[in-house]
Amino acid sequence: MSEFSEKMGMEVGNAFKSGYNCSEAIVEAFRKYAGVNIDDNAFRLASGFGGGIGHARNICGALVGCTMVISTLIGRNTPEEKPLKEIYPVTKEFHDRFEKEFGSTMCKDLMPYEFNTRDHLKNCLKLTNRICKFLAEFLEEKGLITV
């Protein structure tokens, strides 16, 4: 594990403990401590994804937060700026690696505890930490972030 991924794991834990959900905590850690340029309006986009989209236990909110960070680094503002064929392979690769590493991309599979219980909060914090480190290592490997 790199020093950067360890630092990001610590920072996502701080964000989570301060009240951010999994998706927000990932985005906050990268915007605040890794210099990823995500403004407040864009940050708000992460709020509804916690708990697998508003506690629906669907797609993992932390995975969505990771995808938001990656998209901020390699995405586009207009269709003319960059073709999607330059963006999708990177986000797809991260998705596939995530699924292989964690066994699923679904909140209900990753977090089998009742929401807002002690077990849920403890395990979601631990999982969000692992996911944040996983993203940090991916970004370093791809040369998408310099530390």
Over which residues does each language-model region extend?
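Acidic-glycine-rich active-site phosphate/pyrophosphate-binding loop
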Residues: 1-3, 30-48, 101-109
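Polybasic, low-complexity association/targeting segments
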Residues: 1-18
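Phosphate-handling active-site elements
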Residues: 33-44, 72-90
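Transmembrane alpha-helix interface/packing and boundary motifs in multi-pass membrane proteins
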Residues: 48-57
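Conserved phosphate/anionic-ligand binding catalytic regions in large, soluble enzymes, centered on
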Residues: 56-65
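DPxDG-like acidic metal-binding loop motif
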Residues: 65-73
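C-terminal binding/interaction regions
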Residues: 86-147
